[in-house]
């Protein structure tokens, strides 16, 4: 807190004294873009229950940084990065964000995965007026001028997944999630959506601690409820335990389908395609997405990290984030937060998932929706997709059922 107060006081004194344009006027953090380099922060869980997922996001960001540096950097400067471990704890994310912004004075930060970690740092980024580039799909119901939401809003992942299942004839839904803000808000949305579908019903809803490894009682409840499909919003290592214990009961996708929102290629590798094959996921990108840019991305990722490594939606969004920041800085001709923010409005880049564009009103991204099926080779293949990118609607204001149900943020 003292460091933050010193920062705020310095800005106040700078303004009152009307000092020169040098010094306190820049919200990049003074030393972040000095000399021939510009320094950014990377803030992800490299340890703890979320390391299984966040490591690939960090790796994609480093790959993008190295590619950009090799091509000449940003505004003639090479990118350097300071890396911090959020350790799968929201309070640690907050502490590390304070360090990156207050002590290291980085130009921007690429970071977080869980909504709990994002919410833990949100006020800190707003206090310092810096930008967090958040790479993961989330529950929506939020917009901040200090966060660029590179992952899907609920209308670009959750809502179309339920629509797809309903169209396929699934009627009985069991909701299972980790016990924190994303799954609970997602399931609030899903409950409202299912209530509006004729003949559909939620037959059960359960939550597990982030580090929970025992799922036998929950699986018994699922068996008793006999759903057509399990809607899975578990995160981290909980997914490994749940699906392996489901397999121990000899329950496969032929018996009971799952639709997951946080299982990507990395998690399939860890859990096993023999266990997950046939199940469904909803994202905006897969390693198998057929674009020229994606072929280049996958080739570069494997060349750097090994042929056995896989790309994923969050990793691709993190990779895109670094390139979108570069494009915004170059459009603005500046690393200053306000200049970069203004440059973001309507900015598009050619990404591995296809062309993506920033909505300047809410700093979310237009994205193509892709429903995927996990196959025996461990990859995910598109089985349904929108014809074009879907504009973000983080507050679901365009859905009558959401408005009528009074869907609202959960803290």
Residue ranges and their predicted role:
Residues 246-319, 329-333, 385-410:
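Extracellular/periplasmic periplasmic-binding protein-like sensory domains
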Residues 27-43, 70-78, 165-171:
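Immediate post-signal peptide segment of exported/extracytoplasmic ligand-binding proteins
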Residues 304-312, 326-389:
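Segments of small-molecule ligand-sensing domains
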Residues 100, 104-112, 133-135, 174-177, ...:
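Periplasmic-binding protein-like
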Residues 41-60, 84-91, 113-114, 176-184, ...:
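Extracytoplasmic "Venus flytrap"
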Residues 139-140, 145-248, 288-294:
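Extracellular/periplasmic Venus flytrap/periplasmic-binding protein
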Residues 28-32, 52-59, 71-141, 150, ...:
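Beta-alpha junction/loop-to-helix N-cap segments that form part of ligand/metal-binding clefts
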Residues 1-39, 70, 395, 402-411:
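Short, low-complexity disordered leader/linker segments with a strong preference
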